[in-house]
């Protein structure tokens, strides 16, 4: 059916505790058509509707982008995989997004800036992707990296339809 052909992008934020980053990610999620942002109950800036910083940094997107707070990210990823999603983890050592074609049903897992994606979640990923850069520090802010990856998923879907 047509519904099966539609692109669906889910963003999972693993231990992203800075509300500025969460807000900026919600803004990118809105701009590039992500269907849902999932945050863990613990170790996360997840009070989206009550946090003024998230509200301001999202430029209003926090009101539009569906957000789900879950107790267990690993179980959540398993359920998404069972529903036919392909899970991509973002990590500096991954395959360049320039060389990867994202699946129609995509989960994008973003880790904290300090520690990255937790070991267990990383093991659950079907692919690990990275953004090719040319800087000396080989590192992007998590909200910027999420925006770049969401744009690439969006760009591929526009080119494929």
Residue ranges of each PLM-predicted region?
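Active-site/ligand-binding-proximal alpha/beta "capping" segment
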Residues: 88-136, 141
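Structured adenosyl-cofactor binding patch, chiefly the S-adenosyl-L-methionine
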Residues: 30-31, 55-61, 119-161
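Generic leucine side-chain signal with a strong bias for well-ordered alpha-helical environments
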Residues: 13, 73, 80, 108, ...
């Amino acid at each position: 059916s047509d519904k099966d052909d539609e692109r669906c992008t889910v963003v999972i934020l693993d231990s992203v505790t800075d509300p500025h980053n969460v807000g900026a990610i919600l803004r990118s999620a809105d701009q590039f058509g992500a269907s849902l942002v999932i945050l863990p109950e613990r170790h996360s800036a997840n009070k989206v509707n009550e946090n003024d910083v998230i509200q301001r940094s999202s430029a209003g997107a926090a009101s539009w982008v569906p957000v789900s707070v879950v107790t267990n990210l690993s179980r959540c990823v398993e359920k998404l995989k069972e529903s036919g999603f392909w899970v991509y983890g973002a990590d500096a050592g991954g395959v360049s997004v320039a060389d990867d074609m994202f699946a129609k049903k995509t989960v994008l897992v973003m880790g904290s800036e300090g520690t990255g994606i937790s070991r267990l979640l990383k093991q659950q990923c079907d692919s690990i992707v990275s953004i090719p850069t040319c800087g000396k520090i080989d590192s992007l802010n998590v909200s910027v990296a999420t925006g770049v990856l969401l744009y690439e998923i969006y760009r591929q879907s526009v080119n494929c339809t």
